[in-house]
Amino acid sequence: MKDEHNQEHDHLSQKEPEFCEKACACKEQQNEEMQEASEKECEIKEDFELKYKEMHEKYLRVHADFENVKKRLERDKSMALEYAYEKIALDLLPVIDALLGAYKSAAEVDKESALTKGLELTMEKLHEVLARHGIEGIECLEEFDPNFHNAIMQVKSEEKENGKIVQVLQQGYKYKGRVLRPAMVSIAKND
């Protein structure tokens, strides 16, 4: 029995180096496979990060484009409203002129009549509404300003110096600071 045991032990001892070689080869193969898997994982990770970065940059560009379009639409909408208000204001100017003419005619006949008072009140209310919407009359003080006044004629005037406004022939209006219609005036010429 001892002999059998020794033979078996010798047989195992002979197989041990062979087993070690196989185990080492297997371990090396596992290490190589692990290294390949790790390299593949790194490549996948790098590829994912690159695609993520590209997608993020595309998102930022699309978002910026969207914001620019949104701003442009808001600006266009605002400009369209401004244009509409300006157009309405221009269309109202002849009505205002007619109302002012009626008031002046009525005031010449009877300044205290109900008609004159009604026209005056209507003019005041109309100017209040127009002012609320940025439409206001151009002031025609002493100085002539070609940006706001249009000189229709020159008249001799002993009371005014050359180039000063003598009379307003037609009221001018501006919308939010921009001239809708210049005031038509006569200016003094004393040569």
Curated annotation (Swiss-Prot):
Pfam families: GrpE. Keywords: Chaperone, Cytoplasm, Stress response. The keyword S-adenosyl-L-methionine does not apply. Its main location: cytoplasm. It comes from the Bacteria. InterPro entries: GrpE (IPR000740), GrpE_coiled_coil (IPR013805), GrpE_head (IPR009012). GO terms for molecular function: adenyl-nucleotide exchange factor activity; protein homodimerization activity; protein-folding chaperone binding; unfolded protein binding. GO terms for biological process: protein folding. The keyword Transport does not apply. It is found in: Cytoplasm. One of its GO terms (cellular component) is cytosol. Participates actively in the response to hyperosmotic and heat shock by preventing the aggregation of stress-denatured proteins, in association with DnaK and GrpE. It is the nucleotide exchange factor for DnaK and may function as a thermosensor. Unfolded proteins bind initially to DnaJ; upon interaction with the DnaJ-bound protein, DnaK hydrolyzes its bound ATP, resulting in the formation of a stable complex. GrpE releases ADP from DnaK; ATP binding to DnaK triggers the release of the substrate protein, thus completing the reaction cycle. NCBIfam families: PRK14140.1, PRK14149.1. Belongs to the GrpE family. Homodimer. PANTHER family: GRPE PROTEIN (PTHR21237), GRPE PROTEIN HOMOLOG, MITOCHONDRIAL (PTHR21237:SF23). This is Protein GrpE. It comes from Helicobacter pylori (strain P12).
